[in-house]
Amino acid sequence: MPTFNQLIRHGREEKRRTDRTRALDKCPQKLGACLRVSTRTPKKPNSALRKIAKVRLSNRHDIFAYIPGEGHNLQEHSQVLIRGGRVKDLPGVKFHCIRGVKDLMGIPGRRRGRSKYGAEKPKSI
């Protein structure tokens, strides 16, 4: 515990906040190219095959990004737009691919939450 005089002389050092999405370079989104598309199993209580892509961003960072939604058309060398946002049950996956932009198609026929999956408005009957 510092004395009052020590605090006057030196003050307290502020804690530095760490950036969770350092690969984005303070940008809201970044463009990248797929190096590999694969599946990964989640952490302990959950069970699935989550679709992920290894992406090289335009600033030369290599990251893993989650591909949301059912089905996708990504393959090697596809261009994708990446945003921040981790996947809680996949360690090391701290980014999401944005559907409906560049080479990653939106989900056809989706009616709810369309904006999150790049789906077009359905034709009214």
Curated annotation (Swiss-Prot):
Keywords: Mitochondrion, Ribonucleoprotein, Ribosomal protein
One annotated Gene Ontology cellular component of this protein: small ribosomal subunit
BP term (GO), one: translation
GO MF annotation list: structural constituent of ribosome
A Pfam family this chain is assigned to: Ribosom_S12_S23
Domain of life: Eukaryota
Main location (coarse class): mitochondrion
Subcellular location as annotated: Mitochondrion
Protein family per UniProt: Belongs to the universal ribosomal protein uS12 family.
Protein role: Protein S12 is involved in the translation initiation step.
UniProt xrefs under PANTHER family: 30S RIBOSOMAL PROTEIN S12 FAMILY MEMBER (PTHR11652)
NCBIfam families in alphabetical order: rpsL_bact
Protein name, UniProt field: Small ribosomal subunit protein uS12m
UniProt gene name: RPS12
